[in-house]
Amino acid sequence: MSLYSPPKVDVNVVPNPRIINIAGEARLPAIVGVGPTVRYVTDEAVQRGVTNIDTLSVFPASNVVITKVAKRSGLNYVSGSSSNDPDAFVGEFGSLYLPSGSVVNSQIIDGYISLGNGKISWGQDPISVSKGHVPSTGSVYYVSYRYDVTSEQFEPKVFSDKQSLINTYGEEGNTTGSLTTAASIVLENGSPAVIVCQVSGSLSNYSVSSYRDSIDKLRKKSAVEEVIAIFPSGSLPTSTFRDDVHSYLFQHVQLMNSVGRWRGMYYGVPSPKYNPNGFDLIGDATISNSYIGKATTYSDSDVILVAPSVVWRTNSKNERIELDGSYAACAVAGVHAAQTLRSTPITGFAVTGINIEEDKWDMFQMNTLGAGGVLVLQNVAGLITIRDAITTDSTSADTQEINVVSQRRLVQRTLSQKLFETYTNKGKTINPQTVRDVEATTRSILNSLRQSGEIFGYGTKDDPNTGETKITAIQDSNEPRRINVTCSVKFLYPMKFISVTVSTFV
């Protein structure tokens, strides 16, 4: 028996295989720097169990040191201090618990024993419970403690909110909390997220090699748009230390660009208020400890040096935190990452989260800095803006403009990824049709970038006067496993100059 179907019209839309989705993962700033090696927890709520062992949320951990156990949260207690709360004592009417073996009223009491790994042992004596020395079964008490971070602390992590930063790297500061400060500045300037990698070692014991190790870990991350190294405030590091780290970071950028994981390097210099070796000098190419001297050292289209070095910020307690040029670089990186289109120029855009001196330089000084390859932040009437979004390479518009360099990376990344996803390792062989398909796919990719506003256009003809070349694909005669594609693109350049000629008449 045949199936009955009433009169109808069937319509099926067949996807066009040559329409390429160019949407990719967000491009994020990445920060490397020193952070806490010990974490602190205040007033974690714990419910007394039926056995003599209770477990903290951090278990299993190393070197857990309990600093306070209380019946209520917020109890102010420091052993031997006269500024304790009135109920900071042990007993039925007190709010404090003490370790077993403590002496209260000339008697040794039962209490808690920290096992050092996140577990707490309590005495089971009912008399101790009735006296308030031990919490009763089912009751809630509050524990403050510190513990050593694990190796996971030193792996790259992605953050999109400030509280997660605080939970991982502590409250803002310019020493232990410097990663929280730097990453918060990136987020406050609009970046959807930020990648952070803590350098191994404490504030008093970190090295160039530990910075190198953290930078190397970013090799695994494909979403990095630029990398920034920050350093804690204080007598360390030395100028040589910073130079060694920046040199290695520059090598990292060059290496990753050579293997198809394109990214850039943002950096700043220390101020005299942040580091004894800091400086705030315009200088020239011959003076190494000057803005222009540092920009000359890394004159490259993938490098951005941000000035000034004297930067500060107010934390949640309304305290001034002295920062340096690295944090200014974080602010600019956040503005850059906030743009939906890589082609968007950020010259004139506002920067938030940091403070700089108002009217620090006059027009001529800022022009000198710009000519030397320095991106200058200016504060006019309290509004901090990017005076000119440039790299350290002033060779041409293609190398100097940040948005043009970003377009270049986008074209490289998109062509590489989409052609690889479509053709490589797909069991395809090279024949005349394959060559034509690769050419057509290249055209579709570039057209998608043009339609989305990421580039001005792509070449459709050969014009030796402009350098335009049409898209062509051909099998390599020397390496028959390769298809060679040639094409050209025209970038979207920022409008920076307008020339007006005025004539007079009578």
Regions found by a protein language model. Name each.
Residues 91-156:
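Surface-exposed interaction regions enriched in Ser/Thr/Asp/Glu
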